[in-house]
C-alpha cells in the first residue's frame, strides 16, 4: 500500500501540473528512477520474502517437502503466486496512471504509452529484484536481504548526480570546445496551443577561411559571445532536457522499461554529448545560405499503438534512406546529379515509394484543413505576428525564377486571389449562419467591435489561405514525380518541338514564355489529377474542394487555349517562312534561266541517269557531286516533313524530361521550406518550415535563420540504446531467475 500511495502521489503531481508531461517524465526523478526503482525494489523484495523465504523460517516449507509433492511443483506454484502478486500491483499502478485521463494538459496524448510502460516495467523489475532477493536470502535474513538490495539499487540510481561531481556537463564541454548555443522560441503546433517549446541548437559562430568543412571544427568567438553561449547553455539545462543527462547507471537501465523507448520522442534524448554512454559525433554542417538539407517524411508506427518504436531516419546514404522512408536532398540550384541517380535506383526497388510520400503529405494536409485547427493556426500566427515566418504574405513574389514570364505570375496570383476569395466567402457564410443560430443581430450598428474583429479575422484567413495555396503547390510538386498522364507528356513534347523550331524573333524571350507556360501546364495538370482521385481527396475539403476544382478547371482551360493559340501561331509562322523561302528560291532560279536551259536539261538528264546507275550498281561516277547535291535536297525536304509530323516521347525521353521539368516545378515551390529532421538515435534537432507536418514527430516551429548561416547538428550515438537496454534486461531477468531457482531448489532445508 505504501508503494501504491507513492505512485499515486507521483501521478497526481503530473496530473495537476500545467507543465507538459514530456518535461516531467524526462526529468531526473523519473529518468534515473530515483523514486520508482527503489519502491519497486521494496515491493518485490517484500513479496518474495513472504512467498519464498517466510515458509523456510517458520517450518511450513519443511512440512510441504515431507509430503509427496516434488520441489519442482512447489517452485512452480510459488512462481505463479509471485507473478500474480506482481501483476496485481502492476494493474493497480496502471489504474493510478489512468488518473491522467481527467487532466486537460498534454498527458492525454501519451497516456497509453505511459500506462503500458508502467505495467511492463513493474512486472519485469519485480521479477529481477525477486530473483536477487532469493539468492541473498540463502545467506542472510529477510531484513538483511532487503537492506542489501535497496542499498545496491540506490547506489547505482544515484550514480548520475555523483558523476556530475567528477565529469563535466555536456554544456560545459561544448562551451569549452568553442560551441555556442542559440535559443529558438516558438509556439508548438500541438494538442495544446498554449505550450511553448524551446529549442536549443549548437551554432558555429566563426569559421576560418580555407578550412575544409569536413573537419567539422568550430572556432572560439570573442569572450562576450562565449559568455552569452555559456549562459544559454545553463538556461537550456534548467528549462529543457537539452543534453543534461548521464546514463551510466542501473537506475536508467531499469527506468527505461517504464518508457519502452516511446514517450516524448522529440525530447527524449537517449544519447547525450560527452557522456560515457555516448559515442560523440558532430553531425554535418548545414549551410543555410545554400539551403541544402533533407526533407523527410516519417512512416507510421511499426509496432502498433503502444510500442512507438518509430522508424528513425538512420545515418545512411540517399538510396537507403529513400527506400526506408522517402527522403529528398534539396538545393536552391536544383537536384544534384547523384540525388537523381540514387532516386532512380530507389524507384526501381520500390516503385510505390513516391506514392507513399504523397499519401503522407496528403494525410497531413487534410488534417491541416480541419476547421478548428485552421482557426488555431490563424490565432497562433496572429499572436506571433508572423515573425520569422518563411511563408510569403499576400502580394509577395511567388519565388519564381528571374527568367519566368510575367504571365505566369499573373496566372498564379489569379489563382491565389480566387482561393483567398473562397476562404472569405466561406468565413462570411459561416459567421452568418452562426449569428442566425445564436440569435445575434447582423446589423452593423449593433455589432460595433464585432465587425472590426470580423475584418481582422478575414485578414488572418486570407494569410492562412495563401499559405494553404503554397502548401498545395508543394504537394503537387511532390506528386508530379509519379504522374503518368499521356496528355501531359504530349504537351511536353509539343512545347519542346515548338521551342526547337523557333527560328525568328527573340529566342530568349520565347524560351522564357515557353518555360512559364510549361510550368503552369505541369502544375494544373497535377492539380486536376489530385482532385479527380476520390481515394486521395480529403473528406474535410467540403465545398472548398468544389471551388478549388472550379478554379483549377478555369485556369486549365485558359492554359489549354493559350497553348492552342501558340500552336496555331507557330504553325502559321512556320508555313509563312517555308512559303517565303520557296518563293525566293523560285525567283533566283528564274533569274538564272536563259542561255543555260539546254545545259540545265542535260544536267538533269545526267543526274537522273546517275541516280539510276547508283541504285543499280551502288557505285560512284563522274557526276557524284551533282548526285550528292540532289540527295541533300531530298534529305532537307524529308527533315522538314519529319518536323511537321508530331511524334510522342518515348519512355526514355519521358524519363529524361521528367528530371528536367521536376527541377523547375519542385524547387520553385519548395525552396522556402527547410527541414532539419531527426536522424540516428534521437539527435538534437530543430526544424523550420511547413506547419503541422507530422506534428508529434517533428518540432514544427517556424524559425528565422537570418542571423547564423552555419549550423551544426550535434549528434550522439548511444553505445547502449533503449531497445538494446530492454533486450539486455530481459536476458538478465531470465538468467537471474534460473540461478535463483537453482539456489532455492537445492538448498538444505533440514
UniProtKB/Swiss-Prot annotation:
The keyword Transmembrane helix applies. The chain crosses the membrane at residues 2-22, 33-53, 79-99, 116-136, 143-163, 724-744. Its main location: membrane. One of its GO terms (molecular function) is ABC-type transporter activity. Signal peptide: none annotated. It comes from the Bacteria. Keywords: Cell membrane, Membrane, Transmembrane, Transmembrane helix. GO terms for cellular component: plasma membrane. It is found in: Cell membrane. To M.pneumoniae MPN_335. This is Uncharacterized protein MPN_333. It comes from Mycoplasma pneumoniae (strain ATCC 29342 / M129 / Subtype 1) (Mycoplasmoides pneumoniae).
